[in-house]
């Protein structure tokens, strides 16, 4: 794992699911993390349920947290296991 990937994981530990009071890393809501030397980060966000009522909020919080990591220049986020995955993926990746 690269230094940037480790930094992203550490930052994601501060993103807490308000329903479970557990961070998104421990809940395994973020998977397939990859980062290159130019600061491009890719990962998959998998909400805890297919109809998770806070999926949008969590996705936004995750994206903001990753953006705060020094060295991160861009993000590509895949959404899986969610009823409106296509719509959320399009929305969350608009600003990249």
What are these regions (language model features)?
Residues 1-96:
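Domain-level signature for proteins that mediate thiol-based redox and metal-cofactor handling
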